[in-house]
Every structure is written in C-alpha cells, then in structure tokens.
Amino acid sequence: MNNPDQVAKLLSSDGIKNIDVNLLKNQTLTKLNDVINSFPKGESFAKRIVNASESAPINSGSLICQNKGEGVRKHYHPEADEFWVMIKGLHKFEIGKDNKEYIAEPGDIVYSPKNEFHKVTVISEEQGIRFAISLEEKKAIYE
C-alpha cells in the first residue's frame, strides 16, 4: 500500500482529520514538537516523518495524534510487523487472538508481529501521540 492516497483514505476512515503522508525527503533531525505544533491544537493528525523504502525492511514512520476514544480499528498486516513509540497520552492496545490489553504511556514501545490482530484506542483526556513504524507497502486486513 505505497500509494499515499490509499494510506490517507484508511487513516481518514479511522477518524484522523489532518493527514500528510507525502514525505518529500527524510530529515537528519526531526523536532517532534515542531511537527506537533504545525497542526491545529486539539485536532487529530497523522504525518509521515520517516521513509527509508529504498534501504530497509521496516521503512516507514508516521506520527499519529488522536483524541480520547479515537484510534484504529482491529486489523492485522500479513507481511509486516508494526511498532509504536509512545510520545504523549495513554493508549490501550489490544493485541493477539485473545485481545490481550496493554496500557502504553509515554516512553513505552509496543510491538505487534505480522498476522496478529491489533487495535489501538486513546484513553487519556489529553491527546495521544504515537510514532508508528512499519513497512510502507503493507496490507491491512480488518476484522
């Protein structure tokens, strides 16, 4: 799914309002606070800030910001693992066949292997911000 329009459509269907997945060039240093502050305060957003599609098996990183109760629907990726680095707020992850719940806070890293269902929901009053790392050309199979 390397088509930015397809990625934007999926993110939009999960309630994200401001979407920018057209990374023009990787930056040597990305100031996350600058990226966060470039979007309207209080609104959800997704911004691709890493794309190493020419050189790495896990090659895409997007900063995702959502409000309480927002998240991504239960799905899995048949050809790629996915990682998240928690930046702000609390997130509830449901991962695996048994929907095991994990509460992730800033500084935590969450991992879901390929073919494992996972769902993410922001549970804090403040916005939840996470950095999602995975394969750019990955399929998402929804439950």
Where do the model's predicted regions map?
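A short, N-terminal "cap"/entry segment at the start of jelly-roll beta-barrel domains
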Residues: 1-58, 73, 143
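Conserved short histidine dyad/triad with adjacent acidic residue
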Residues: 62-78
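Residue-level recognition of conserved beta-strand positions in structured domain cores
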Residues: 63, 76, 87, 95-97, ...
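Histidine-centered metal-chelating micro-motifs
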Residues: 71-73, 92, 100, 108-110, ...
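A short beta-strand-loop-beta hairpin characteristic of the jelly-roll/cupin
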Residues: 80-106
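Ligand-binding loop in jelly-roll beta-barrel domains
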Residues: 105-106, 114-141
